[in-house]
Design a protein with these regions (language model features):
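Non-catalytic terminal and connector segments of soluble metabolic enzymes
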Residues: 1-149
Length: 149
């Protein structure tokens, strides 16, 4: 089963969208195998967004992610990375189609509510940044055969 990291960023937490957003992932059939509320340190945020370090928006990205609590989710399911990215929508909420998280709840590029890993390799690296191995719990839900088939 594939795993991916999802962050419900500080704007999602402040807007009290946690329950609504988590429900969208669960209703799609993804399984939560890890979940916690974190106030990201500057060090964690910089490691997480290291690929953007040379970009001009890097400082504001770090300031945003460290500016309030974030919900870190480890989700599991078939093609979890692609499924999450489709549910999230485009980075720019104003251009994201209705029916996606960003299309329904965001009009910003930076304050776009969620982060999702963009590849399986990055998902593994990001999950290791945000979760200890013993914080990820594998289990088979009673609806497994109905959702996965």
């Amino acid at each position: 089963m594939e795993r991916t990291l999802v962050l419900l960023k500080p704007d999602a937490v402040q807007r009290r969208l946690i329950g609504s957003l988590v429900a969208r992932f669960e209703l799609k059939g993804l399984q939560i195998v890890g979940m916690k509320l974190v106030h990201a340190s500057k060090e964690l945020a910089e490691k997480h967004y290291d690929a953007h370090r040379a970009r001009p928006f890097f400082p504001s990205l770090i300031q945003f992610l460290t500016g309030g609590p974030t919900v870190a989710l480890a989700l599991q399911g078939p093609n979890a990375v692609a499924v999450v990215r489709n549910l999230m929508g485009l980075t720019d909420g104003a251009k994201s189609p209705p029916g996606t998280i960003r299309g329904d709840y965001s009009i910003s590029v930076q304050n776009n509510l969620v982060h999702g890993s963009d590849s399986v390799d990055n998902a593994n690296q990001e999950l290791a940044l945000w979760f200890k191995a013993d914080e990820l719990i594998s289990y088979q839900g009673c609806d497994h055969n109905w959702v996965i088939g």
